[in-house]
């Protein structure tokens, strides 16, 4: 970004009257817990300025679990850290409960950060202190009386399932238990927002599921707004309500998780979600050709169910419409946010229908269908 463009960005930031007009036209903005408006962040180094974020316009609703994904260097950490002002934006605004936190002085920033909890990939526990002491420490620093501290720590250790580990030291805990301590510590000041920065990336799959279950419970019981960044797409699928995709500091796609996962539009989204997709089995891919080599060659179809319909896919109707011998080579259907999302690779042999007819019939019953080629 040029120096001229940097100077112009603040001029594009909406005024208070413009924000009011936008909120009137879009009532959901009035409910936004966190809102980013034309947000930009530029770092200045020896090699010159590097734009980490640009023109970010985004609203996170109260009480939702909101995911941020993107490739390395996309700006995920920079974005999440502007919520508690650990990162100072170069331009634009961050509103929390409709209040511009960029105008806060140091005292208000301290108060803000107490209302925003944060957990990290590395648990940041003090090795010489017990579980109880690690959770209690922020309360002690804040000058909370001993009795209140004791009550709060006991409540939080029960919430995260560590009441029997209060005298243990971090070295005696598993990775999942350490993260539970981190979560308890992040909740000591009764925050309204919880930020999760790769909170499960150091954990095994089973422990990850237990931590996600705890975060889901906290979200439901306490009404917390949770904003998380992760490179694990399964985490977004399993816990988030909505997701935004970043690329080179820009938003390239956003929406409900079922929508983005079921029918990704941007190439970056498709690349990130590729590990969750099932591909053509190798033994079939090696035999694939554009034209049938024999009269009994099988046509391979790639069929997607995007969740756009409230009703699940009717596989029986699909197989009947295709006719002939239909074989499922790879894939399946799962439910994300009560929507049926599926990806099937089908082999169709012996059908009376032509290639174009088979494709048309598949598209009548599935939102997306493509011909991969022939085998045989």
Curated annotation (Swiss-Prot):
It is an enzyme of class 7 (translocase). Its EC number is 7.4.2.11. This is Methionine import ATP-binding protein MetN 2. It is a peripheral membrane protein. The complex is composed of two ATP-binding proteins (MetN), two transmembrane proteins (MetI) and a solute-binding protein (MetQ). PANTHER family: AMINO ACID IMPORT ATP-BINDING PROTEIN, METHIONINE IMPORT ATP-BINDING PROTEIN METN. The keyword Nucleotide-binding applies. Pfam families: ABC_tran, NIL. It comes from Pseudomonas savastanoi pv. phaseolicola (strain 1448A / Race 6) (Pseudomonas syringae pv. phaseolicola (strain 1448A / Race 6)). Gene3D superfamilies: 3.30.70.260, P-loop containing nucleotide triphosphate hydrolases. SUPFAM superfamilies: ACT-like (SSF55021), P-loop containing nucleoside triphosphate hydrolases (SSF52540). Part of the ABC transporter complex MetNIQ involved in methionine import. Responsible for energy coupling to the transport system. GO terms for cellular component: plasma membrane. ATP binds at residues 70-77. Keywords: Amino-acid transport, ATP-binding, Cell inner membrane, Cell membrane, Membrane, Nucleotide-binding, Translocase, Transport. It is found in: Cell inner membrane.
């Amino acid at each position: 970004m040029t120096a001229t463009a940097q100077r112009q960005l603040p001029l594009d930031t909406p005024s208070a009257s413009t924000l009011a007009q936008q909120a009137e036209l879009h009532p959901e903005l009035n409910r936004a817990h966190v809102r980013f408006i034309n947000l930009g962040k530029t770092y200045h180094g020896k090699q010159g300025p590097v734009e980490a974020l640009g023109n970010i316009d985004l609203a996170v609703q109260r009480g939702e679990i909101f995911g941020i994904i993107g490739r390395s260097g996309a700006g995920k950490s920079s974005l999440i850290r502007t919520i508690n002002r650990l990162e100072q934006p170069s331009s634009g605004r961050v509103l929390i409960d409709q209040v511009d936190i960029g105008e806060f002085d140091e005292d208000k920033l301290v108060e803000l950060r107490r209302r925003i909890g944060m957990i990290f990939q590395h648990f940041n526990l003090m090795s010489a202190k017990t579980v109880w002491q690690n959770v209690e420490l922020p309360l002690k620093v804040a000058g909370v009386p001993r009795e209140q501290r004791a009550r709060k720590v006991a409540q939080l250790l029960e919430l995260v399932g560590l009441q029997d580990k209060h005298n243990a030291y971090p070295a005696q805990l598993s990775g999942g238990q350490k993260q539970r301590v981190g979560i308890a510590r992040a909740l000591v000041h009764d925050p309204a927002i919880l930020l999760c920065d790769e909170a499960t990336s150091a954990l095994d799959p089973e422990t990850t599921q237990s931590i996600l279950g705890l975060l889901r419970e906290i979200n439901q019981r306490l009404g917390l707004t949770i904003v998380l960044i992760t490179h694990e797409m399964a985490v977004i699928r399993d816990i988030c309500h909505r997701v935004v995709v970043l690329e080179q500091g820009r938003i390239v796609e956003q929406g409900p998780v079922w929508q983005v996962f079921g029918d990704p539009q941007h190439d970056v989204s498709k690349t990130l979600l590729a590990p969750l997709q099932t591909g053509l089995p190798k033994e079939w891919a090696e035999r694939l050709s554009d034209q049938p080599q024999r009269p009994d060659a099988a046509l391979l179809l790639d069929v997607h169910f995007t969740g756009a319909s409230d009703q699940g896919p009717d596989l029986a109707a699909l197989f009947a419409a295709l006719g002939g011998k239909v074989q499922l080579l790879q894939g399946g259907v799962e439910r994300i946010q009560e929507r049926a999302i599926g990806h099937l690779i089908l082999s169709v042999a012996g059908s009376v229908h032509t290639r174009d007819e088979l494709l048309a019939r598949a598209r009548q019953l599935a939102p997306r269908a493509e011909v991969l080629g022939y085998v045989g």
